[in-house]
Amino acid sequence: EGVKHVIGCYTSSSRKEVIPIFEKYDGLLWYPSHYEGFETNNNVIYTGAVQNQHVLPLMNHVLAHITRDVYFVGSNYVWAWENGRIIRELTKAHGGKMIAERYLQVGDLDVARIIEEIHEKRPAFIMNMLIGESSYAFYRAFAKARDENAALQKTLVGSCTLCEPELAQIGPQACAGHLASSVYFSTIDTEINKQFVTSYRQRYGHDALPSADAEASYNTVHLLALALAGADSVDIGRVKKALHKTSFQAPQGIVHVDPESNHSYLTVRLGISREDATFKVISEANAPVRPDPYLVWAEACGESSAQSKTPMAQNNIGLRIVR
C-alpha cells in the first residue's frame, strides 16, 4: 500500500514477527515499548527503554541498599529470559545469587506454587518479570502472603513494567509499596508533565493516568512528525537523518535518538507505588541516559562488575535522590 512509517507493537515477539515485512518493503517501524535489548535494526526506531535504562538501575539500587540475593519470577518468554540472565550474572558478579528462578506461561494465574516457595525462602527482594494478568495475580497473592507471614513484612517486590493503570487493576489492598524502574511516572513534577496528564485525563477520563508506554507512544508521534517535517519527505533514509538532528521536550524530559543504535536517550527513574495508583519518585537521572542495547558500556555482566561504577555513572550520569 506504500506505507512507510508505522508506530506500533508491544511485545518483542510481535516486533520480531513484523520486522521482516519492514525490511522487505523498506518501511520504518517506530517501536515505543520498553524491551530486553540485544537488537538493532535499520528498519526500526526504538523509543522505549532498554536494559541500562530499566533493569540495571533497579538492580544497582537493590544490590547497594537491599540485598545481593534475588528471588526471580517471570513470564516464560524472551522479556523475562533475557532479564533473568542479566540479573543472574549481575548478582553473581556482586557476590550474591538467584535464590530461585521461576517461570509461568504468559497468562497463567496459578501463582500458588510460587507463593508457597516465597513463604519458605523468605527473600528480602523479589524481581517480578511477570506480565499482564499473571503479574496482577502475583501481587494480590503476595499481599495476602505478607499479611499472613511476618517474615515477609519487609520483602520488597521490584518490577520494570509496573505502571499506573496496572496499579489500578491490582487494587489498593495489594498495589502499594513496590519498587519500579521506569523512564516515566505520572507524578513527575514539571509543568510539561502536568499539562500532559491533564490533557490525557480530558481525553480518557478524570481518573485515567498515563503509563510509560502511553508517554512513549506520545513522544514517538512527535518525534516522527518532527523528523518528517525536517526531511520534507517520507523516505526513511532522509527521515532518519532528520530524526538524528532533532529532539523532543517530552513529559519525562528531553528525548532524542542515538544515531549509532536508533535507540533513545531517556531519563531513568525509580519509584515506589502507592495505594492511590501513583508512584512516589525516589530517584532520577540528572540527564537523559545513553541507550546501551548490547550492554557495551555498562559491563553489567562482567567479572569486574562488583568493583565497577554503576552504568549511569559510566555514562557520566548519576541518579539523584528526589525528596
Where are these regions (language model features)?
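Extracytosolic ligand-binding ectodomains
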Residues: 1-323
